[in-house]
UniProtKB/Swiss-Prot annotation:
Pathway: Cofactor biosynthesis; adenosylcobalamin biosynthesis; cob(II)yrinate a,c-diamide from sirohydrochlorin (anaerobic route): step 6/10. GO terms for biological process: anaerobic cobalamin biosynthetic process; methylation. Its EC number is 2.1.1.195. This is Cobalt-precorrin-5B C(1)-methyltransferase. Belongs to the CbiD family. InterPro entries: CbiD, CbiD_sf. It comes from Pseudomonas putida (strain GB-1).
Length: 364
């Protein structure tokens, strides 16, 4: 077996989530209001008990409110928010409650199906809890019995959000404030997988009975062309087909179409749930075996085994009149069906680099 791309893992630096940034800036602003204390750094406690210190860009009074900001540091993770200025504005309330507001660059939920209700600011539950716990501790220390209004902002967040799944999920106007551990693990993929689950949830809750999970832009374009599916029904799964298949056990959407490049679909056919080259490889001898099952002679089998890429193997089979693309999709279909509930109808498409369909199996 050989990999089609080479990637060498290296030690990477962790960062802090937007939820941690919002907690730190909210705490600093509230402390300034209650005690008059300001500083250029603030310490917060993460959900698992680790204490981290975060540098502040500013902490100042703004009329009856206070505001504090920090630069988001995602470590070595390719996070669109890395380096963005996140700042919180805090206002004191008479009633003992904490009210969250979506400020500039933070989105608002507009579709049902997410963990937050329609109309709520896109500040997820764990960041809300982190902020609330820190502000309550501060209130106890200061003998304060009122509440807080917390407005979270991300400079340039509305444009940054266009690079995320938020528009497709119905989170409009900016980014989501995220995080479950408070720490960004480089390339941990947790946020990506969460967005896949959210995409399925939103499509299902809004009544869509057919979704297409796609590995990239070309496969999404193919699904638009073949089925005319709207954005809400297109799930950008990347390499994480396992995240789609397993989630359908919880949310059994009636019909699932899987669409991806031939090489990635061949990995799914071999039973891989993660299609990235770090975790799964193209098995050319297996491709040759599947070609043999549908009539490939010994010479073609040898040529497939010796191919440089799966695309070359496919081209060799196609030139010999062997429908390897369909065979691979049939094996991928069988594996996918073994994971999802029986009531979910599944089909699989394989495409070439130009988006042309080179294989298909399942519902027609």
């Amino acid at each position: 077996m050989r990999e089609e791309t080479r990637e060498q893992p290296a030690p990477l630096r962790s960062g802090l989530t937007t939820g941690s940034c919002a907690t730190a800036t909210s705490l600093a602003a509230a402390r300034l209001l209650l005690s008059g204390e300001t500083s250029d750094a603030v310490s917060i406690t993460l959900p698992k008990g680790k204490v981290v210190q975060m540098r502040l860009e500013f902490c100042r009074l703004a009329g009856e409110s206070a505001e504090a900001g920090t630069l988001k540091d995602a470590g070595d993770d390719p996070d669109v928010t890395h380096g963005a200025l996140l700042y919180s504005q805090v206002r004191l309330l008479d009633e003992p409650s904490i009210r969250f507001v979506a400020g500039s660059g933070v989105g608002t939920v507009t579709r049902p199906g997410l963990v937050l209700a329609v109309g709520e600011p896109a500040i997820n539950p764990v960041p809300r809890r982190m902020i609330s716990e820190h502000l309550q501790r501060l209130a106890d220390e200061c003998g304060y019995f009122g509440g807080f209004e917390v407005t979270v902002n991300v400079q340039g967040g509305e444009q940054l959000a266009l690079k995320t799944m938020n528009p497709r999920l119905g989170i409009l106007g900016g980014l989501s404030i995220l995080g479950t551990s408070g720490i960004v693990r480089p390339f941990s993929c947790a946020a990506y997988i969460a967005s896949i689950h959210q995409g399925i949830d939103v499509a299902h809750t809004n009544g869509y009975t057919h979704i297409a999970a796609c590995t990239g832009n070309a496969s999404e374009d193919t699904m638009r062309r073949v089925y005319g599916l709207p954005e809400i029904a297109l799930i950008e799964m990347g390499d994480f087909v396992g995240a789609v298949l397993k989630h359908l056990r919880k949310v059994p959407v009636p019909r699932l179409t899987l669409c991806g490049g031939f090489g990635k679909i061949s990995k799914l056919a071999a039973g891989h749930m993660d299609l990235h080259s770090r975790h799964s490889s193209i098995d050319l001898p297996q491709l040759a075996g599947w070609a043999a099952d549908i009539g490939a002679d010994a010479a073609l089998q040898a040529a497939i085994i010796g191919a440089n890429t799966s695309q070359q193997a496919l081209a060799l089979a196609h030139a010999a009149g062997i429908a390897l693309g369909d065979a691979v999709c049939a094996h991928a279909l069988a594996f996918a069906r073994s994971v999802v509930p029986a009531q979910v109808q599944v089909e699989v498409f394989a495409i070439d680099r130009q988006g042309g369909i080179v294989g298909r199996a399942g519902v027609q």
